[in-house]
């Protein structure tokens, strides 16, 4: 039997707060391995622009590259449409052995959000929670809400005792855009990836675009992702962003420019007999 923990997140970017949580969970003695789930299209973030899924997956992968007990999953990224936690858990359960245990790891804010999720009763009946207190919430407040969930759902909730590292993804992105020192914010491998691809270089202008454009591009990315290796995929995303930047500057169709940039190499990694 393997004791798995599931830690999900947008990871935009993966930062030292995520890394600290992972290390605390592994050091708790309660977990053998961690599944790091990179978020797909989240139901509560449809009006928020996030970086392309493949960028976020690669940042997470590099952020834990030295931790053998951690595996990064793209299960949600590969799924079309919105990703609900219950659907992810159902799919993940099919990949685990019947005698494996799965614990869900969250920040304490989830204790207040969970009742509004899809099928919270099913989630809490099947899976125990391991909670890290953070976000300015006191342990007393978190424990009071945990007691309410125990009473309403018979939830199994345990708290991590070690202090967390409080970091804001927005703060980290702004630091990277300004090319300021980031050693205390993100792992070195992640910083190198961000710098090499200038991942947040056009954020000021691209964030202002209609989120519907990003949803369309995200769907194209999901479809093209299986056909490209990592190097070619990241290159295509870089071209997509630069094409959109130029389209905005010259008042051209931003969506068309983005699609053209993303798909310009879509057959580059295919065998000749497949293309023909």
Predicted regions and their residues:
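Nucleotidyltransferase catalytic core that binds NTPs
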Residues: 1-215
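Acidic/His-rich, divalent-metal-binding segments that scaffold phosphate/diphosphate chemistry
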Residues: 202-276
């Amino acid at each position: 039997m393997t004791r798995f923990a599931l830690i999900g997140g947008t990871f935009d970017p993966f930062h030292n707060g995520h890394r600290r949580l992972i290390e605390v969970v592994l050091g708790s003695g309660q977990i053998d391995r961690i599944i790091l789930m990179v978020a797909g299209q989240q139901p509560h973030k449809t009006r928020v622009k996030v970086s392309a899924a493949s960028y976020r997956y690669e940042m997470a992968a590099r952020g834990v590259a030295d931790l053998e007990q951690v595996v990064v999953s793209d299960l949600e990224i590969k799924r079309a449409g919105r990703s609900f936690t219950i659907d992810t858990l159902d799919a993940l359960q099919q990949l685990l052995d019947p005698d494996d245990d799965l614990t869900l790891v969250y920040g304490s804010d989830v204790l207040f959000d969970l009742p509004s999720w899809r099928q919270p009763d099913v989630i809490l009946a099947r899976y125990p929670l391991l909670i890290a207190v953070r976000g300015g919430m006191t342990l007393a407040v978190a424990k009071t809400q945990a007691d309410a969930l125990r009473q309403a759902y018979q939830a199994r909730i345990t708290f991590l005792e070690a202090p967390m590292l409080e970091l804001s993804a927005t703060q980290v992105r702004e630091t990277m855009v300004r090319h300021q020192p980031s050693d205390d914010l993100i792992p070195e491998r992640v910083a190198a990836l961000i710098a090499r691809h200038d991942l947040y270089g056009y954020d000021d202008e691209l964030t202002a675009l209609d989120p519907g454009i990003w949803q369309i591009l995200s769907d194209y990315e999901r479809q093209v992702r299986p056909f490209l290796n990592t190097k070619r995929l990241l290159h295509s995303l870089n071209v997509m962003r630069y094409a959109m930047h130029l389209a905005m500057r010259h008042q051209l169709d931003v969506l068309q420019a983005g699609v053209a940039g993303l798909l310009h190499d879509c057959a580059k990694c295919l065998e000749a007999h497949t293309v023909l």
